[in-house]
């Protein structure tokens, strides 16, 4: 326990909370343009071809973001909405692209967890 004179000399330091998605600049989402759409492989115990896109955001940042779901229609120059959220087995991927918004279509024939993949409610037979 420090004395009062020690606290006068050197006050307590307030810990700064670092953002996990700094490129969004405290916004819930940001719009951006795809500069490159490609696949990459995950870290050690896992094996796959994960779909990712390099996106230039409206604030000038260039980020790598993940395209969730099965199949997508993204190309270079597609306009997308980027949200926070990292992908644990892809180093450097700290953002997700929102499905069913702007140029990216929702997942086709998705029945469960539809809101996360921008899929409309299926028509009843």
UniProtKB/Swiss-Prot annotation:
Residues where 3-methylthioaspartic acid is found: 89
Xref: PROSITE patterns: RIBOSOMAL_S12 (PS00055)
SUPFAM superfamilies on file: Nucleic acid-binding proteins
GO molecular function, one term: structural constituent of ribosome
Species in which this protein is naturally found: Bordetella petrii (strain ATCC BAA-461 / DSM 12804 / CCUG 43448)
Domain of life: Bacteria
NCBIfam families: rpsL_bact
Entry's Gene Ontology cellular component terms: small ribosomal subunit
Family to which this protein belongs: Belongs to the universal ribosomal protein uS12 family.
Protein name: Small ribosomal subunit protein uS12
Complex formation: Part of the 30S ribosomal subunit. Contacts proteins S8 and S17. May interact with IF1 in the 30S initiation complex.
Function: With S4 and S5 plays an important role in translational accuracy.
Keywords, alphabetical: Methylation, Ribonucleoprotein, Ribosomal protein, RNA-binding, rRNA-binding, tRNA-binding
Single GO biological process annotation from the record: translation
Keyword set includes Repressor: no
HAMAP family to which the protein is assigned, alphabetical: Ribosomal_uS12_B
């Amino acid at each position: 326990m420090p004395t009062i004179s020690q606290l006068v000399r050197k006050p307590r330091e307030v810990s700064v909370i670092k953002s996990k998605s700094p490129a969004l600049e405290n916004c819930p989402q940001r719009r951006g343009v795809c500069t490159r759409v490609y696949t990459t492989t995950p870290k050690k115990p896992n094996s796959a071809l994960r779909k990712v896109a390099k996106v230039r955001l409206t604030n000038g940042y260039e980020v790598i973001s993940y395209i969730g779901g099965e199949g997508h229609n993204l190309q270079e120059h597609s306009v997308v909405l980027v949200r926070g959220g990292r992908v644990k087995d892809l180093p450097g991927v700290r953002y997700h692209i929102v499905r069913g918004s702007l140029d990216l279509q929702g997942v086709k024939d998705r029945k469960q967890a539809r809101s996360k993949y921008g899929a409309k409610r299926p028509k009843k037979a």
